[in-house]
Each structure stands twice: as C-alpha cells, then as structure tokens.
Amino acid sequence: VYISAIYVNHLYQAYMWAKAYPQIEFVVGGPVAAERIMTKGKWNPIYIEVDKNVTLPKNLTVTGKSVEDWFGVPNFSGNWKLDIPKDIPKDSKIYFSYTLDNRCYWKKCIYCNIALHAEEVFRERKRIDCEFADVDHEGMKIVRLNTGSITPKFLREALPSLPNRPDLDYRLFIRSGTVETRALEDALKKMNGNIPNLVLGFGMEFPSNRMLKYAGKGFTTGELLDFLHLCKAYGLKINANFMLGWNNLIEDDLRALETFMAAMPEDAVTTAQIRWLLAHPFARVHDTYEGEPLWVGPFYEGFRVAVNDEQKALNRQALDIVKEYSRIKHFEVQGLVSIRQYMR
C-alpha cells in the first residue's frame, strides 16, 4: 500500500495500520516524509523526530523519495493525470497540487526547515504544460502551484502560461522582496490583461525591519509595501501570514508595525492568517525557544513556543493593532480562536 502523507497525523495513521496489519507492506512518502539526507535503510526526517524508544514496524517504510524516484523513472516524465472519485459531486470545489519544485530557494527563515531538503531528491518541472486544465470535473478547480517559495524564473515562465478560465483558481506562495516583485510585474505585464484568478500567499510575519531581519526574511517593510501596491494594481488576492509568539519584541517593533499598517494600501490584503510560532525540530528557533512538546504517537513535531508575561503583553498589543487595521484596510483576520490560548 502506497500512501502520500501531507501531515503528521497521516503518517501516524499509516503507522497504526502497519501495526494492525503486519502482513501488508506500507510505503509512505509525501511532504511530511521529506528527508535531510538519503541513507539506504534509514529514514532521516526533516519535520519530525521519532521517539528513540520506539521501533517502527518492519512493514512500514517511510521515504523522502518522489513516486518517480521510488520506481526509478525520471521525475515529471509521465503524463500528469488526476482521477476524481465518483462520490464527489460534479459541481463541488476540488483542491489539488501541481508541483513546480520541492524546495525553497531562499532557505534563510529561522523558523523553517525546508532548506534542509536532501539535494539528492530535488526535482524541478522543466515544462509547464498545465495538464490540470483537462481534469474531468465540472466544478471549481483550485490548483496549488506547489513550491517551497516560487522562484523568479517560475514567476516569469509559469504565470503567463496558466489557462484563464472561470473554473480555475490558482494558489502559490511568494516572497515579497524586490527581485520577486519585479519578476511578478514582468509576468503580469506579459499577460496583457489576461490574468487568471490568482491568490498569492506570502510571509509578512512581523513587519518591523528589526523583526524581519531577525527572522531572516531578507526584505524590508518598504519592499513589502511595493509588493502590495503592485498586487492591488493588478487585482490579485493576497493571503498574508502574520506570526506571533516572538520572545524578543520591543516597543519600537509595535510602533513600526502600526506605521506599516497605516501605510498599507486599502483592499490590498484579502485575508491575514494569524499563527503562533511553532518550533519544528531542526529549525533554528527550536534551540532558542521553549515550549511543551507536541507528540502524535511516536512522532515529535516540535512545540508551540512559550513566552513570558511581558512578551505576551507585547504580542497581544501587536494582535490588537492588526485587528484594528483589518477594519480600516478591509481584510479578514483568521486564526483568532486558536491563537488566543497562547496569550493567556
């Protein structure tokens, strides 16, 4: 049985199946199975650690290889195809991935460990054929252009080739530095007004220049604003990721945040996803923060960071600023229910 595991709970389910059915061989790949190095007979995960006191079942193999690598054929060499299960209503929305590559070219954010992906299993699509346009489904098709963070090269090559149809929406993650903004502008100009439904996700994290530098983002608040002005000019939808849980905020960061939010163009951001910092194993923040360990069975996925009362107050003030400007700048704040538990 071959399983593609996106989240650790999928991996845990495969682990439980392997224990329950020892006569069946289970092979698990997918995003959560990614490896730091490729060692024969050993799994070297990036996103989780396995309890040292637990031995995984012998009939469970976890691998960072792609399906093509596993079966020994060139990546992206086959015909891309997606069969929709018959019990899914024909007019419903479906969401699927179209992989461009499997790493982040930036590699410097302190809370992320995508940079650790083993080079031996790097894969990159050479031809953007957009085969997903032929999926046999009448409803809305939401296509994730899957990368760690889309490269300037793919911005210029992939975006102008996307079919523009009312039944196709696209999602992608982009850095908001000057190089990426220029590449995005080049692609949008090349489309000459024939722009499909694009939703761009980007990591705003904490928009003060001091905190952006600390987090390893590699851009400034000025570059962020340039990116947002461009997206608004072309009518793109923006999902901004805003991160809290920092243990080093100062009053100047709050003033810088308010200055940024005041300067942000109205109606530029559609949604703001508020997240509390998660320290993954092997990420740099894992060694500089503390928190209660998160386990799913024998799989350790890090911890939600704990901060002292003074830092909780500063993080709470930052959240209040974002909420206040959501009404002024007309964007929806998401994630409030889950994040409040960490501020008590």
Task: Describe these PLM feature segments.
Residues 39-41, 109-110, 158, 184, ...:
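Short aromatic-enriched loop/helix-cap "lid" or pocket-rim segments at secondary-structure transitions
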Residues 179-180, 247-257:
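Active-site glycine- and acidic-residue-rich loops that bind
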